């Protein structure tokens, strides 16, 4: 006991300066003791629910729906709460109301004959759901989440249990007054959004917000207003981040991909970027070229005129050629990238329209190259350079794009360690024997965690450096390397065969060899080694990975390496759904364990509201906690325990007279 007392005295002395500062915040024994009790209570609350999504690819309608229904969590809560008390049709209506309160209320107000009765029944049900989803949080945390205009009323309704006669009358009178003063519609909207907020404590987006889908900017708007979110950048995200940072080669890739999928709305409508300079240039130089290989891939639910398709095709080819030229320049600037094999324009034989790759000749299926000088194939002609500068200026000066990219930097990283899980989009580059691949950056080699840390720093410098500085140009090229470099943790392939897919019919040339990581991600020992590299040694640690769609219809399992690695690809991109057989996976991590959720196809928001159709989701509880996880078991819990330790030292210092209490007279 004496030894323990001496140890505590030493700890107080070692931390005395800090404890004096802490005493300003908790100036009395009572205040320090109260905070200790509060923190100890919080540690014993159930851990909050984490929601993991990946590979959204600009599909904003499906993304917003999955966000609103929390991958089926709200529907399951309604089932648990009401059981047999409500019919299935009533449960569906209640769920739809919680997801889309404003839109659903507009429909109900036109249909419902006795709206006051409907309001009364619905308000009681919503309060019951809200009480359930708020039960795992402190009153203080719930209070911070409450909408200001109804904060007092909601707090009263959540914490008043209408059991006694007086309490029941008080409770009923609040509901009655909300309806009588014509505030029921606004109240229902507010409490529905509160339920959406409370049902998920933290959202993780494991990359690729951007890509071929219609409006990635709408998704970014939604994430900006979300209460707690982090992002692990994907390869498509980094491309847009590079474009906003002033990288012409990243920008050319962004425009080419958008044109390929006839998705120019994110660029033009979302970010206000004028593509007229490219359209004019394309008509001038490719006006008589049918550009058959560059016809956009159009989804069945979109309609374009023949002229629109032709124009997009010409823009597509024009920017593709510009891209190949800019990439050639970047490769020449950086021999350390080891990407000389991707310089293909100089390998074209313009006499017989062939190209030699790996010692074999291939016939080109398109020989119209009006802007390529065969003696200097990577040189931009004046008109191309002018188009690039105009477009680059538009990307760099788009206020909304800059705001979104700043958000990606402030809320994102290449990887994240969170609650014993390692989150990243692509891969950790490996050698053929499963060891970490060393990658040369500048004059130093990096591997494993150090590689991702270095690339993360370079990506940030690219955006935040002064424009036109030498450094910013180097970092801009590094962002492009992250998009398509052979050892990029975001790309994860030996090469990107864009040129071959456009100009060579032989599909053997289209093959893109994957990083050895994708062979080893089924190997438990390799996955454990990756986790240890990032400082995660716990038996409960997992890798949560996106990027590559899981081919469920061919029997592929998203749970790999004996549960150490989980692949989630939200399946939001319709182009992959025929390949995967489902609309993808999301992950829920709550106090009871990990739940993998597979989703069927989502149709439209309009149908979800009018016909009350929800995404059909199947849940697999693949890892159940032996005991319910508490806040004390989380990363936040570690911080709280540190605070508790410091407060206990402060309390002891007060009691020993080493620090004086400050009691107001």
Curated annotation (Swiss-Prot):
EC number per UniProt: 3.1.3.11
Coiled-coil features, chain-numbered ranges: none
Names of the cofactor(s): Mn(2+)
Substrates-to-products reaction catalysed: beta-D-fructose 1,6-bisphosphate + H2O = beta-D-fructose 6-phosphate + phosphate
Pathway where this protein functions: Carbohydrate biosynthesis; gluconeogenesis
EC supergroup of this enzyme: hydrolase
GO molecular function: fructose 1,6-bisphosphate 1-phosphatase activity
One BP term from GO: gluconeogenesis
Key words of the record: Carbohydrate metabolism, Hydrolase, Manganese
Alphabetical list of Gene3D superfamilies matching this protein: 3.60.21.10
Family: Belongs to the FBPase class 3 family.
Protein name as it appears in the record: Fructose-1,6-bisphosphatase class 3
Organism name: Clostridium acetobutylicum (strain ATCC 824 / DSM 792 / JCM 1419 / IAM 19013 / LMG 5710 / NBRC 13948 / NRRL B-527 / VKM B-1787 / 2291 / W)
Lineage, highest ranks first: Bacteria, Bacillati, Bacillota, Clostridia, Eubacteriales
Gene expressing this chain: fbp
